[in-house]
Amino acid sequence: MATAKRAQGSQSHVAIAFEADFGTTPSTGGVITPIISSSVKASQNLNDSTVIRGDRNPAAPFRGNIDTSGSLTVPVGVIDIGYWLKAAFGQPTSNTTGQAPNKKSEHVFKIGNTMPSLTIEQGYPDVNVFQQFAGVRVSKLGFKFGGDSELTASVDVMGCKETLAATTFDAAAKAVNFLPFQNLNATIKEGGVTVANILSCDINFDFGLDGDSYAIGGKGFRTYIDPGIVSISGTIKAFFQNKDLLNKAVNGTESSLELQLAQDDWTLTFKLPELVYERQSPGIDGPRGVNIELPFKAYYRADAGRSASIITLVNNQEQY
Protein backbone atom coordinates (compact mmCIF):
# COMPACT_ATOMS: atom_id res chain seq x y z
CA MET A 1 0.00 0.00 0.00
CA ALA A 2 1.35 3.39 -1.00
CA THR A 3 2.16 5.79 1.82
CA ALA A 4 0.51 9.19 1.53
CA LYS A 5 2.84 12.16 1.65
CA ARG A 6 2.76 14.50 4.61
CA ALA A 7 3.22 18.25 4.87
CA GLN A 8 6.79 19.47 5.19
CA GLY A 9 7.73 22.33 7.49
CA SER A 10 10.32 23.54 4.99
CA GLN A 11 7.59 24.08 2.39
CA SER A 12 5.09 25.65 4.78
CA HIS A 13 4.60 29.36 5.37
CA VAL A 14 3.06 31.94 7.67
CA ALA A 15 1.19 34.76 5.98
CA ILE A 16 -0.33 37.70 7.85
CA ALA A 17 -2.66 40.53 6.91
CA PHE A 18 -4.14 43.33 8.98
CA GLU A 19 -7.93 43.37 9.19
CA ALA A 20 -10.01 46.42 8.32
CA ASP A 21 -12.90 44.89 10.29
CA PHE A 22 -12.15 42.80 13.36
CA GLY A 23 -12.42 39.09 12.59
CA THR A 24 -12.88 39.51 8.83
CA THR A 25 -10.08 37.98 6.76
CA PRO A 26 -8.99 40.33 3.96
CA SER A 27 -8.38 39.07 0.43
CA THR A 28 -5.44 41.41 -0.23
CA GLY A 29 -2.53 42.86 1.71
CA GLY A 30 -1.01 39.54 2.70
CA VAL A 31 2.66 39.30 3.65
CA ILE A 32 4.64 36.06 3.95
CA THR A 33 6.90 36.62 6.92
CA PRO A 34 9.92 34.51 7.92
CA ILE A 35 9.58 32.36 11.02
CA ILE A 36 11.56 29.95 13.15
CA SER A 37 8.43 28.11 14.29
CA SER A 38 4.69 28.65 14.54
CA SER A 39 2.29 26.73 16.78
CA VAL A 40 -0.95 28.69 16.48
CA LYS A 41 -3.92 26.34 16.78
CA ALA A 42 -7.56 26.01 17.71
CA SER A 43 -8.28 23.55 20.51
CA GLN A 44 -11.59 22.35 21.90
CA ASN A 45 -12.01 20.25 25.02
CA LEU A 46 -14.24 17.21 25.22
CA ASN A 47 -15.87 17.61 28.64
CA ASP A 48 -17.14 14.66 30.64
CA SER A 49 -20.87 14.38 31.17
CA THR A 50 -22.15 13.98 34.74
CA VAL A 51 -25.47 12.43 33.66
CA ILE A 52 -26.56 9.34 35.66
CA ARG A 53 -28.61 6.80 33.66
CA GLY A 54 -28.98 3.83 36.00
CA ASP A 55 -25.82 1.95 35.03
CA ARG A 56 -22.07 2.48 35.12
CA ASN A 57 -21.59 3.33 31.44
CA PRO A 58 -20.39 6.88 30.70
CA ALA A 59 -22.66 9.23 28.80
CA ALA A 60 -21.33 10.89 25.67
CA PRO A 61 -18.99 13.84 26.30
CA PHE A 62 -19.90 17.34 25.19
CA ARG A 63 -17.73 19.86 23.41
CA GLY A 64 -16.51 23.00 25.15
CA ASN A 65 -15.54 26.41 23.83
CA ILE A 66 -12.78 26.77 21.24
CA ASP A 67 -9.51 28.43 22.20
CA THR A 68 -7.55 29.91 19.32
CA SER A 69 -4.07 30.80 20.52
CA GLY A 70 -0.43 29.92 20.24
CA SER A 71 3.12 31.14 19.88
CA LEU A 72 5.45 32.06 17.07
CA THR A 73 9.20 32.41 17.21
CA VAL A 74 10.31 34.90 14.58
CA PRO A 75 13.68 36.29 13.53
CA VAL A 76 14.39 39.95 14.22
CA GLY A 77 14.84 41.18 10.66
CA VAL A 78 15.26 44.70 9.30
CA ILE A 79 11.91 44.63 7.46
CA ASP A 80 9.83 41.80 8.92
CA ILE A 81 10.03 42.80 12.59
CA GLY A 82 8.11 45.95 11.70
CA TYR A 83 4.99 43.91 10.94
CA TRP A 84 5.05 42.27 14.36
CA LEU A 85 5.69 45.61 16.06
CA LYS A 86 2.69 47.04 14.22
CA ALA A 87 0.58 44.06 15.32
CA ALA A 88 1.61 44.71 18.92
CA PHE A 89 1.66 48.51 19.11
CA GLY A 90 -0.42 49.70 16.18
CA GLN A 91 0.39 51.92 13.22
CA PRO A 92 3.76 53.63 13.74
CA THR A 93 4.57 57.27 13.08
CA SER A 94 6.64 57.03 9.89
CA ASN A 95 8.87 59.56 8.19
CA THR A 96 10.92 59.04 5.02
CA THR A 97 13.91 61.11 3.98
CA GLY A 98 16.14 60.97 0.90
CA GLN A 99 15.68 59.21 -2.40
CA ALA A 100 16.52 55.68 -3.50
CA PRO A 101 19.09 54.18 -3.14
CA ASN A 102 19.78 56.43 -0.12
CA LYS A 103 16.20 56.52 1.17
CA LYS A 104 15.66 56.04 4.89
CA SER A 105 12.35 55.54 6.67
CA GLU A 106 11.96 55.93 10.43
CA HIS A 107 9.07 54.15 12.14
CA VAL A 108 8.31 54.99 15.77
CA PHE A 109 6.13 52.57 17.74
CA LYS A 110 4.54 53.68 21.02
CA ILE A 111 1.80 52.36 23.29
CA GLY A 112 -1.52 53.74 22.04
CA ASN A 113 -5.17 53.43 22.96
CA THR A 114 -6.03 51.00 20.16
CA MET A 115 -4.64 47.71 18.91
CA PRO A 116 -4.97 46.21 15.42
CA SER A 117 -6.23 42.74 14.62
CA LEU A 118 -4.90 40.46 11.96
CA THR A 119 -5.41 37.20 10.15
CA ILE A 120 -2.62 34.65 10.48
CA GLU A 121 -2.38 31.80 7.99
CA GLN A 122 -0.33 28.66 8.52
CA GLY A 123 -0.13 27.31 5.00
CA TYR A 124 0.79 23.80 3.89
CA PRO A 125 0.71 24.14 0.08
CA ASP A 126 2.16 20.67 -0.51
CA VAL A 127 -1.06 19.16 0.89
CA ASN A 128 -3.40 22.07 0.01
CA VAL A 129 -4.37 22.89 3.60
CA PHE A 130 -4.38 26.45 4.92
CA GLN A 131 -5.22 27.18 8.55
CA GLN A 132 -6.60 30.71 8.70
CA PHE A 133 -6.99 32.33 12.10
CA ALA A 134 -9.06 35.52 12.13
CA GLY A 135 -9.52 38.16 14.80
CA VAL A 136 -5.99 37.66 16.12
CA ARG A 137 -4.22 40.02 18.50
CA VAL A 138 -0.75 39.85 20.02
CA SER A 139 -0.98 38.94 23.69
CA LYS A 140 2.73 38.91 24.54
CA LEU A 141 5.95 39.95 22.83
CA GLY A 142 9.40 39.06 24.13
CA PHE A 143 13.02 39.76 23.15
CA LYS A 144 16.25 38.25 24.49
CA PHE A 145 19.43 40.17 23.74
CA GLY A 146 23.00 39.00 24.32
CA GLY A 147 25.07 35.89 23.71
CA ASP A 148 25.85 34.36 20.33
CA SER A 149 22.49 32.77 19.54
CA GLU A 150 20.33 33.78 16.60
CA LEU A 151 18.37 36.90 17.51
CA THR A 152 14.68 36.05 17.73
CA ALA A 153 11.44 37.34 19.20
CA SER A 154 8.64 35.35 20.80
CA VAL A 155 5.11 36.33 19.78
CA ASP A 156 2.14 34.93 21.71
CA VAL A 157 -1.22 35.46 20.07
CA MET A 158 -4.91 35.05 20.88
CA GLY A 159 -7.56 34.76 18.20
CA CYS A 160 -11.23 34.21 17.53
CA LYS A 161 -11.90 31.83 14.67
CA GLU A 162 -10.13 29.13 12.68
CA THR A 163 -11.04 28.26 9.09
CA LEU A 164 -9.54 25.28 7.27
CA ALA A 165 -9.28 26.32 3.63
CA ALA A 166 -8.03 24.63 0.46
CA THR A 167 -6.42 27.82 -0.89
CA THR A 168 -4.54 30.74 0.58
CA PHE A 169 -6.51 33.89 1.46
CA ASP A 170 -4.22 36.02 -0.74
CA ALA A 171 -2.56 34.38 -3.72
CA ALA A 172 -0.62 37.61 -4.35
CA ALA A 173 0.97 37.74 -0.89
CA LYS A 174 4.58 38.85 -1.10
CA ALA A 175 7.48 37.34 0.82
CA VAL A 176 9.46 39.77 2.95
CA ASN A 177 13.09 40.39 2.00
CA PHE A 178 14.98 39.02 4.98
CA LEU A 179 18.03 40.76 6.45
CA PRO A 180 18.63 39.87 10.11
CA PHE A 181 19.81 42.02 12.97
CA GLN A 182 22.44 40.29 15.10
CA ASN A 183 23.41 40.30 18.77
CA LEU A 184 26.96 41.02 17.65
CA ASN A 185 25.99 44.56 16.63
CA ALA A 186 24.07 45.57 19.76
CA THR A 187 24.87 48.47 22.08
CA ILE A 188 23.15 49.39 25.33
CA LYS A 189 22.73 52.43 27.55
CA GLU A 190 21.84 52.19 31.22
CA GLY A 191 20.72 55.39 32.88
CA GLY A 192 21.59 57.29 29.69
CA VAL A 193 25.22 56.12 29.67
CA THR A 194 26.65 53.61 27.18
CA VAL A 195 27.97 50.61 29.11
CA ALA A 196 29.89 47.45 28.27
CA ASN A 197 29.22 45.42 31.41
CA ILE A 198 25.75 44.02 30.63
CA LEU A 199 25.80 40.40 29.49
CA SER A 200 22.14 40.01 28.57
CA CYS A 201 18.87 41.89 28.57
CA ASP A 202 15.36 40.49 28.28
CA ILE A 203 12.37 42.73 27.51
CA ASN A 204 8.83 41.35 27.73
CA PHE A 205 5.54 43.02 26.87
CA ASP A 206 2.16 41.72 28.07
CA PHE A 207 -0.76 43.46 26.39
CA GLY A 208 -3.38 42.40 28.92
CA LEU A 209 -5.83 40.85 26.45
CA ASP A 210 -9.28 39.87 27.68
CA GLY A 211 -10.22 36.65 25.93
CA ASP A 212 -13.26 35.84 28.07
CA SER A 213 -15.64 36.75 25.26
CA TYR A 214 -17.59 33.64 24.29
CA ALA A 215 -20.99 35.05 23.38
CA ILE A 216 -24.13 33.00 22.79
CA GLY A 217 -24.43 32.39 19.07
CA GLY A 218 -20.68 32.44 18.53
CA LYS A 219 -20.57 28.66 17.98
CA GLY A 220 -17.90 28.26 20.63
CA PHE A 221 -15.51 30.83 19.18
CA ARG A 222 -14.55 34.11 20.79
CA THR A 223 -16.48 37.02 19.30
CA TYR A 224 -14.04 39.78 20.31
CA ILE A 225 -10.76 40.34 22.16
CA ASP A 226 -10.31 43.49 24.22
CA PRO A 227 -6.82 44.97 24.72
CA GLY A 228 -5.90 45.91 28.29
CA ILE A 229 -3.21 47.82 30.13
CA VAL A 230 0.28 46.96 28.90
CA SER A 231 2.86 45.66 31.37
CA ILE A 232 6.58 45.76 30.61
CA SER A 233 9.13 43.71 32.50
CA GLY A 234 12.52 42.18 31.98
CA THR A 235 15.90 41.33 33.45
CA ILE A 236 19.44 42.53 32.95
CA LYS A 237 22.47 40.41 33.78
CA ALA A 238 25.64 42.39 34.39
CA PHE A 239 29.15 42.07 35.76
CA PHE A 240 29.14 42.72 39.51
CA GLN A 241 31.85 45.41 39.53
CA ASN A 242 30.57 47.84 42.16
CA LYS A 243 27.43 48.86 44.05
CA ASP A 244 26.03 51.23 41.41
CA LEU A 245 23.34 48.98 39.92
CA LEU A 246 22.57 47.30 43.22
CA ASN A 247 22.12 50.66 44.92
CA LYS A 248 19.56 51.65 42.29
CA ALA A 249 17.60 48.51 43.15
CA VAL A 250 17.99 48.96 46.91
CA ASN A 251 16.90 52.60 46.83
CA GLY A 252 14.21 52.25 44.16
CA THR A 253 16.00 54.82 42.02
CA GLU A 254 14.41 55.43 38.64
CA SER A 255 16.61 54.53 35.68
CA SER A 256 16.30 53.82 31.96
CA LEU A 257 17.46 51.38 29.31
CA GLU A 258 18.15 51.95 25.64
CA LEU A 259 19.28 49.08 23.43
CA GLN A 260 20.15 49.50 19.77
CA LEU A 261 20.74 46.93 17.04
CA ALA A 262 22.51 47.95 13.84
CA GLN A 263 22.79 46.25 10.46
CA ASP A 264 24.43 48.21 7.65
CA ASP A 265 22.54 51.53 7.56
CA TRP A 266 19.53 50.20 9.46
CA THR A 267 18.79 50.27 13.18
CA LEU A 268 16.27 49.01 15.71
CA THR A 269 16.20 50.85 19.04
CA PHE A 270 14.31 49.88 22.19
CA LYS A 271 13.96 52.67 24.73
CA LEU A 272 12.44 52.26 28.18
CA PRO A 273 12.62 55.82 29.54
CA GLU A 274 11.34 55.09 33.04
CA LEU A 275 11.94 51.89 35.01
CA VAL A 276 12.89 50.60 38.43
CA TYR A 277 14.91 47.53 39.34
CA GLU A 278 13.74 44.84 41.71
CA ARG A 279 16.08 44.29 44.63
CA GLN A 280 18.00 41.06 44.08
CA SER A 281 21.47 40.72 45.59
CA PRO A 282 24.21 38.67 43.88
CA GLY A 283 25.69 35.49 45.29
CA ILE A 284 28.84 33.41 44.96
CA ASP A 285 28.17 30.47 42.64
CA GLY A 286 31.76 29.24 42.38
CA PRO A 287 35.27 30.41 41.58
CA ARG A 288 34.36 32.26 38.39
CA GLY A 289 33.35 35.89 37.95
CA VAL A 290 30.31 37.15 39.87
CA ASN A 291 27.32 38.55 38.00
CA ILE A 292 24.22 40.35 39.19
CA GLU A 293 20.73 39.80 37.76
CA LEU A 294 18.20 42.56 38.26
CA PRO A 295 14.57 42.18 37.18
CA PHE A 296 12.90 45.46 36.24
CA LYS A 297 9.52 46.96 35.45
CA ALA A 298 9.01 49.86 33.06
CA TYR A 299 6.19 52.41 33.22
CA TYR A 300 5.10 55.85 32.06
CA ARG A 301 4.97 58.71 34.53
CA ALA A 302 6.48 61.94 33.17
CA ASP A 303 8.79 61.21 30.23
CA ALA A 304 8.45 63.57 27.28
CA GLY A 305 7.86 60.63 24.93
CA ARG A 306 4.57 59.90 26.73
CA SER A 307 5.00 56.13 26.43
CA ALA A 308 6.50 53.46 28.67
CA SER A 309 8.18 52.01 25.60
CA ILE A 310 9.47 53.73 22.46
CA ILE A 311 10.71 51.46 19.67
CA THR A 312 12.29 53.05 16.60
CA LEU A 313 12.93 51.06 13.42
CA VAL A 314 14.97 52.59 10.60
CA ASN A 315 14.94 50.80 7.24
CA ASN A 316 14.06 51.45 3.59
CA GLN A 317 10.37 50.50 3.74
CA GLU A 318 8.15 53.58 3.68
CA GLN A 319 5.00 52.23 5.35
CA TYR A 320 3.64 49.31 7.35
Label the model's feature ranges:
Residues M1-Y320:
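Signature of extracytoplasmic/envelope-associated structural regions
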